[in-house]
A protein has these predicted regions:
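Secondary-structure transition/turn motif
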Residues: 75-81, 144, 167-171
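Short, ordered beta-strand-loop transition motifs
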Residues: 63-70, 153-161
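Acidic/polar low-complexity flexible segments
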Residues: 3-29, 101-121, 173-254
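Extended, solvent-exposed segments with strong compositional bias
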Residues: 122-160
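Hydrophobic residues positioned within well-ordered beta-strands of beta-sheet architectures
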Residues: 71-73, 95, 163-165, 182, ...
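Localized edge beta-strand/strand-to-loop motifs within extracellular or lumenal beta-rich domains
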Residues: 157-176
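N-proximal, solvent-exposed amphipathic alpha-helical segments enriched in charged/polar residues
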Residues: 31-51
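Surface-exposed, glycine/proline- and aromatic-rich loop segments on solvent-exposed faces
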Residues: 12-26, 44-131, 193, 250
Length: 254
């Protein structure tokens, strides 16, 4: 048979087992429930693989735990299913996390896919990509265009509907009080889509989302921001060859 995927040698079993959360919570940023509609218009694909047709892309918050040598990022969703048998335990969620914590960086995405741009005041310094298939969904990216699977582990706790990302502190270890800004994008994972984002068209089909006004529409279904309406306002400013420009959510590191 054809080898569809292989787990990393170092942790061959860690992916399929629910990950226990260990560490002290240092940060929690909530996201409104029921806003998995991108700019406010997006609808689910029609194939039964997307049942229950709600909640699969609905990010509820981002928590960060201090786990010693690593940070543990926890992303709970309203729903989590695995109809396609993804090794990491979740089929649908695609997370792109961009961190701005120092000078310099980039204002375009790591790879062409999401159809967004980033605030010129907050260029990103580190990119985390999480999806259910480790060969492309367990990556750390850098502004120079290089990326690695070293120092990142992506798993899940399906019982609690959580995507769990462990990041080695060698990649990111801010000082207390340091300003850290987060761009947290949720897409619909598509193994054949641009940078594994599922396309959005005017009308939903079996395998594409609906609700786009034109081909410049962002492929972002949910975006981390605590206040209602901010995500929709940001993501709806596209068209005429221009992509939506995202602003990051910034905190003083505890």
């Amino acid at each position: 048979g054809r080898v569809v995927d292989a787990a990393p040698d170092a942790h061959p079993l860690a992916l399929s087992l629910p990950q226990r959360l260990a560490g002290k919570e240092v940060l929690a940023i909530p996201d409104p429930e029921g806003d998995e509609h991108g700019p406010g218009t997006y609808t689910y694909p029609k194939d039964n693989a997307f049942a229950p047709f709600q909640g699969l892309f609905d990010l509820l918050e981002m928590r960060i735990l201090d786990s010693g040598a690593t940070w543990t990022f926890v992303f709970p969703f309203k729903e989590m299913t695995n109809p396609w048998g993804a090794p990491a335990g979740f089929s649908h969620q695609l997370l792109n996390v961009y961190l701005d914590f120092k000078d310099g960086g980039r204002t375009d995405p790591f790879a062409k896919g999401a159809k967004v741009a980033f605030d010129p005041e907050h260029p990103w310094d580190l990119f985390l990509k999480a999806a259910g298939w480790p060969q492309y969904g367990q990556r750390v990216g850098f502004p120079d265009g290089t990326d690695t699977a070293d120092g990142i582990t992506v798993g899940s706790n399906p019982a609690d509907k959580q995507v769990i990302v462990q990041l080695d502190k060698k990649h990111f270890n801010p000082a207390s009080g340091q300003r850290v800004c987060f761009y947290v994008l949720v897409g619909s994972q598509d193994g054949y889509g641009p940078d594994h984002f599922r396309p959005v068209a005017k009308e939903a089909g079996p395998w594409n989302l609906g609700g786009a006004e034109n081909e410049d529409a962002p492929l972002v279904v949910d975006y981390l921001w605590p206040e209602k309406g901010v995500q929709e306002a940001m993501l709806s400013r596209y068209g005429g060859g221009r992509h939506a420009v995202l602003k990051p959510y910034c905190v003083a590191w505890p």
